Amino acid sequence: MVHFTAEEKAAITSLWGKMNVEEAGGEALGRLLVVYPWTQRFFDNFGNLSFPSAILGNPKVKAHGKKVLTSFGDAIKNMDNLKTTFAKLSELHCDKLHVDPENFRLLGNVLVIILATHFGKEFTPEVQAAWQKLVSAVAIALGHKYH
C-alpha cells in the first residue's frame, strides 16, 4: 500500500480541483494513442485512428478519455485504498479486455505531461512528485489482477 502525506494529498487535490476533466481526459488518451500507437488495438471500434489529428479530434477518444480521467477522481477520493477502488476495473482490463498492464503506467506518465502543460509554473517539482506517485500507484492497482 502506498502512503500519501498530507502535503502530497493537498498538492494532488488542489490541482485536481482546477482540472477540466473532459478536456484533459481526451487529450491524455489521445496523446497515449499517438505516442504509443500499439495501444490503438484496444480501440478498434473508435473509427479512424490513422493519424494524429484524426485521433485528437475523435469524439469517442475524447469521451473515453473523460471516462478514464473521471476514474482518477475516484483515486483521489480513495488514495488510501486504491487496490479496492480499482479492483473491478483491474478485473475488466485483465480478464475481458486483455490490456497489457504496462499501458496503465504509460497513461499515467502521459497524464503527468498533460498536467505540466496545463498548469505550467504551478506544476512544481513537488506537485509533480505527488502526481507521479499517484499515477504509479493507480497503475499498480489497475494491474493487481494480473498478479
From Swiss-Prot:
One of its GO terms (molecular function) is metal ion binding. GO terms for cellular component: blood microparticle; haptoglobin-hemoglobin complex; hemoglobin complex. Residues 3-147 form the Globin domain. Pfam families: Globin (PF00042). Red blood cells. One of its GO terms (biological process) is hydrogen peroxide catabolic process. Gene3D superfamilies: Globins. InterPro entries: Globin (IPR000971), Globin-like_sf (IPR009050), Globin/Proto (IPR012292), Hemoglobin_b (IPR002337), Hemoglobin_oxygen_transport (IPR050056). The modification Phosphoserine is found at residue 14. Heme b binds at residues 64, 93. Keywords: Heme, Iron, Metal-binding, Oxygen transport, Phosphoprotein, Transport. PANTHER family: HEMOGLOBIN FAMILY MEMBER, HEMOGLOBIN SUBUNIT EPSILON. Belongs to the globin family. Heterotetramer of two alpha chains and two epsilon chains in early embryonic hemoglobin Gower-2; two zeta chains and two epsilon chains in early embryonic hemoglobin Gower-1. The epsilon chain is a beta-type chain of early mammalian embryonic hemoglobin. This is Hemoglobin subunit epsilon.
